[in-house]
Amino acid sequence: MKAQIWNKRIWINSYNPNELKEIFNKYLIDSGFKILGFQEHYFTPIGYTALWLLGESHFAIHTFPEECKSYIEISSCNVEYFNRFLKSVKQYKIIRENETKKV
């Protein structure tokens, strides 16, 4: 296997932790990723961050409720799963995204 990682960073206009966790967990599974672990943290008074450890790398969410948006980032060594995931995310509430990077 060649050492390559595909990465995408996206801002979305949703910041509800329950909605985000449910929809992105589904997108990851439907894309073929193997979820090895999941961690989340709720900030006081508001805010949320979550991290999925994947067999193929990782996915993270960071909410910014005061600005009504969230930042998501996916990194993957499996370009097929990565592209499936991005196709699912395109149906979601994207504000701004960076170009896909292969590292």
Predicted features along the sequence, with ranges:
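Polybasic/polar functional segments that serve as interface/processing modules
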Residues: 1-103
